[in-house]
Amino acid sequence: MHYPEPISKLIDSFMKLPGIGPKTAVRLAFFVLDMKEDDVLGFAKALVNAKRDLAYCSVCGHITDRDPCYICNDSHRDQSVVCVVQEPKDVIAMEKMKEYQGVYHVLRGAISPMEGIGPEDINIPQLLKRLHDETVQEVILATNPNIEGEATAMYISRLLKPTGIKVTRIAHGLPVGGDLEYADEVTLSKALEGRREV
């Protein structure tokens, strides 16, 4: 179907988002066209502001509007325990359970040779520097229970073995192949509680 150029560009823009195919992109484009102009401008402004005002924490790699982030800045947090997760959305999922009191390190990805992603392409070098510079007693590996997440956890645990830092892996109350962000608070809580040393 041929659309006027502004609609085609809008459809193409929506298709760049994960999980949005051509049909959904067309629906979203026409939905936006039916919105009030003030709502469209507010939506566009929210997108621009989020992109402009948010960055990654220089300490942990979590998404933040200040550096360091609110978690790294919290003096009540146990700085000796670092929970390693793949994405910022995993931090948000962990924080929902309101039980974990340590700090985080966000890898912003996982090792995936099939996609050409190696250890140097994610925040593993920053993790090693952080563990060298800070007094950390335990690293909790909370990567996703899929092939990439398991490979990443195994790689990090092998790297940390000589350091003497206790390395644990969250328990698998999470489904294999699942993502942390989709787990409910109870499942995450049980997985954290049942972590094991690796």
Curated annotation (Swiss-Prot):
Keywords: DNA damage, DNA recombination, DNA repair, Metal-binding, Zinc, Zinc-finger
SUPFAM superfamilies noted in UniProt: Recombination protein RecR (SSF111304)
Domain Toprim, residue spans: 80-175
ZnF (C4-type) intervals: 57-72
Protein biosynthesis keyword on record: no
PANTHER family: RECOMBINATION PROTEIN RECR (PTHR30446:SF0)
Function per UniProt: May play a role in DNA repair. It seems to be involved in an RecBC-independent recombinational process of DNA repair. It may act with RecF and RecO.
Family: Belongs to the RecR family.
Protein name, entry field: Recombination protein RecR
Species of origin: Bacillus cereus (strain ATCC 14579 / DSM 31 / CCUG 7414 / JCM 2152 / NBRC 15305 / NCIMB 9373 / NCTC 2599 / NRRL B-3711)
Name of the gene: recR
